[in-house]
Amino acid sequence: LGDVYKRQDYFQTVKGGGHGDYRLITLAPASVQEMADFVKLGFDLAFKYRNPSIILADGVIGQMMEKVVLPSPQPRLTEEEIRQARPWATQGKPAGRTRNVITSLELDPARMEENNLRFQAKYQEIEKNEVRYEELDCTDADYLLVAFGSMARICQKTQEMAAAEGIKLGLLRPITLWPFPSDIISCYADKVKGILVPELNAGQMIEDVRLAVNGRVNVEHFGR
């Protein structure tokens, strides 16, 4: 646990966790405010797509002290409102409808394939609608940093130091690690001279950055 703050375990949340072609909506906060905001966002996305979401916050963000503005409380839904908004929800067996059985277990091969294709269609919908990222001073940048979490905060100071040396350095911060902002990173491959991916690990997100640029620009890693 002596170096737990370092572990930005991108692989664990974005790539790992179990077998099967499943995906986790992964939110990466870079501030204490986002830590709070992403709890609600994570639940909203999970309910919207009926898909697990996870917040990947490293130890630096977890131990940081900053001011936070909490959202206003929302009224609890009544049982009838839940039935209208979430007809799949398990609430016992209310009168007027058949019971809900939530399971992904299918023993018939045709039904199994149908189920898997339905999941993949859902993941494509998430990739289409839910990619989130932040761009800082990227418009005329000669070089690009791609970083998430506390490392993105550190990179903002790096940008200031680079500007003092006359280096045009942009920062692209993925907010969703999945769905990953591959398209926007791909666009920068034709605009910048090089990309650096700083991470608090030995090199994990850099693999997806390299896939996004597809060899069109040099991508290097800096990690601890």
What are these regions (language model features)?
Residues 195, 199-224:
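Peripheral docking tails and interdomain loops at the edges
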